[in-house]
């Protein structure tokens, strides 16, 4: 039987279905029907675990329990790269569901059969809700335009809509993946649209909330530590005093700026390429289609999406994603500094700086009993390093848009989404398992501050830089205190030293 089917496909003898079959096809409602209909191979193969579907290259076996079709299967054959861990990110698939629903709704306004449009919208909603995730097997490493993933989405929505209308999977009747689901669209404008939708949602649902949580926790610690005076450090060496609260206020400001930078990049992310079709001209769309689709997407997501003012830029360049990735890269730099400072200040417990007492979350060593490590700081710094690497990849991808189309799209969005998720999740983890539980080791802080030679800086206005420097160097050489040395050198009295060297008076301008 299957040999006969293969020969039939090879000879391309496609038979026209009888008029009665066309008339009785479920849900046609006057919709355009292809001139030629593939042979009834799907029914013939249904007794097994697969059905036969066709693309322009010929027939392929498609698993009966999957909604995708021939083009998706062909992509799995051609791009066996990386395995399941390299699949197209779920946020992109969900974003496609949102886009396809919006497009179907607008296409209905322009004359698409309401029965077909409604079925597409229902199927697209299921995609957007994640109900059909198992039907998207394709990896990131495919065509750089994301065409295979766009067709994966089209096929899944088409077959699910056909099923809803009582039709036969793979028949493309009454809902065709290209003619109906992809109507007025191209992979070249749908994929960048899905990229922006996915990135915006991830930023708003994961990244910004995580950073805000971290900001608030650091701000609370800054206020809690406002009266604790400690020695400062520059070049990792002793410097003049400040409060632990002041030190933490620097971290607060860094995270505040991170949020500001990310928000500043979002207006370009809100611009959608939909309506540009193949090269940005809008071929095969209707006037107003782009604006209406953007408005529908905005309504569905609650985010201020608009149509891109220049579709040529929206298809050929992805500077908006590079900009957002750059903001996240800067955020990673900030978080690397913050996490490193906190773990170094908490080093010890007896042989390090030991100014901070960090929460103990789990055993730290398989050989050293009782050892506890700053694991949340380590996780955060690894995340920061990964985000920096992701930005390099995004930068390379963004710089390689050639002529009318950038063909690094899947790789770019994979890394942008990865960075947003990692930074958001790590911020929450770092906050809940480290920052909120940080305590100040005031005994250690006071000891280190009182032993610091840099308190001598307070004497500059009274005895001059050169004498103050001699006090510090002599005290360091002899192992004596600043006060003892200053008196021994005859530069000032004990009373003068006590009056002039007061750490609490060294915290700001007079």
Swiss-Prot record:
Transit peptide (first-last residue): 1-44
Spans traversing the lipid bilayer: none
SUPFAM superfamilies to which the protein is assigned, alphabetical: L-aspartase-like (SSF48557)
Disulfide bonds: none
Modified residues (N6-succinyllysine): 61, 66, 80, 115, 122, 223, 292, 467, 473
UniProt signal peptide: none
A GO CC term assigned to this protein in UniProt: nucleus
Family statement drawn from the similarity comment of this UniProt entry: Belongs to the class-II fumarase/aspartase family. Fumarase subfamily.
Quaternary structure note: Homotetramer. Interacts with H2AZ1.
Function: Catalyzes the reversible stereospecific interconversion of fumarate to L-malate. Experiments in other species have demonstrated that specific isoforms of this protein act in defined pathways and favor one direction over the other.
NCBIfam families, A to Z: fumC_II (TIGR00979), PRK12273.1 (NF008909)
Protein's name according to its UniProt entry: Fumarate hydratase, mitochondrial
Source organism per UniProt: Macaca fascicularis
């Amino acid at each position: 039987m299957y040999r006969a089917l293969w020969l039939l496909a090879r000879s391309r003898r496609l038979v026209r279905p009888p008029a009665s079959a066309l008339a009785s096809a479920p849900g046609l409602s006057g919709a355009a029907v292809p001139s030629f209909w593939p042979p009834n191979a799907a029914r013939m193969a249904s007794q097994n675990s697969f059905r036969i579907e066709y693309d322009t290259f010929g027939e392929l076996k498609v698993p009966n329990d999957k909604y995708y079709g021939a083009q998706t299967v062909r992509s799995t054959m051609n791009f066996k790269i990386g395995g399941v861990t390299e699949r197209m990110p779920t946020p992109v698939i969900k974003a496609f569901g949102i886009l396809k629903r919006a497009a179907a709704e607008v296409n209905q306004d322009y004359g698409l059969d309401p029965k077909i449009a409604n079925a597409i919208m229902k199927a697209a909603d299921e995609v957007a809700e994640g109900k059909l995730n198992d039907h998207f097997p394709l990896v990131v490493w495919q065509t750089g335009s994301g065409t295979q993933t766009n067709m994966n989405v089209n096929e899944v929505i088409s077959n699910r809509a056909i099923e809803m209308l009582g039709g036969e999977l793979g028949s493309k009747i009454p809902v065709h993946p290209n003619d109906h689901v992809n109507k007025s669209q191209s992979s070249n404008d749908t994929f960048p649209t899905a990229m922006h939708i996915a990135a915006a949602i991830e930023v708003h649902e994961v990244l910004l909330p995580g950073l805000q949580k971290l900001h608030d926790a650091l701000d609370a610690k800054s206020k809690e530590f406002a009266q604790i005076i400690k020695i400062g450090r520059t070049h990792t060496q002793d410097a003049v005093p400040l409060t632990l609260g002041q030190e933490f206020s620097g971290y607060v400001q860094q995270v505040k700026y991170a949020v500001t930078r990310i928000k500043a990049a979002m207006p370009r992310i809100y611009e959608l390429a939909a309506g540009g079709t193949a090269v940005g001209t809008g071929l095969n769309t209707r006037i107003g289609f782009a604006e209406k689709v953007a408005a529908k997407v905005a309504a569905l997501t609650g985010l201020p999406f608009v149509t891109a003012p220049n579709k040529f830029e929206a298809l050929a360049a992805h500077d908006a994603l590079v900009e957002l990735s750059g903001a996240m890269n800067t955020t990673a730099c900030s978080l690397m500094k913050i996490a490193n400072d906190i773990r170094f200040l908490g080093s010890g417990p007896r042989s390090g700086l030991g100014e901070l007492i960090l929460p103990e979350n789990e055993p730290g060593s398989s050989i050293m009993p009782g050892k506890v490590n700053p694991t949340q700081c380590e996780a955060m710094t690894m995340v920061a390093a990964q985000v920096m690497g992701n930005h390099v990849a995004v930068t390379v991808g963004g710089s390689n848009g050639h002529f009318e189309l950038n063909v690094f799209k899947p790789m770019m969005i994979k890394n942008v989404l990865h960075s947003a998720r990692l930074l958001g999740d790590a911020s929450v983890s770092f906050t809940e398992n480290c920052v909120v539980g940080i305590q100040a080791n005031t005994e250690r802080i006071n000891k280190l501050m009182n032993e610091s030679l840099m308190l001598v800086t307070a004497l500059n206005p009274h005895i001059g830089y050169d004498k103050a420097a001699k006090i510090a160097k002599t005290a360091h050489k002899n192992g004596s205190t600043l006060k003892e040395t200053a008196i021994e050198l005859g530069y000032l009295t004990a009373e003068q030293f006590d009056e002039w060297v007061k750490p609490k008076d060294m915290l700001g301008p007079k």
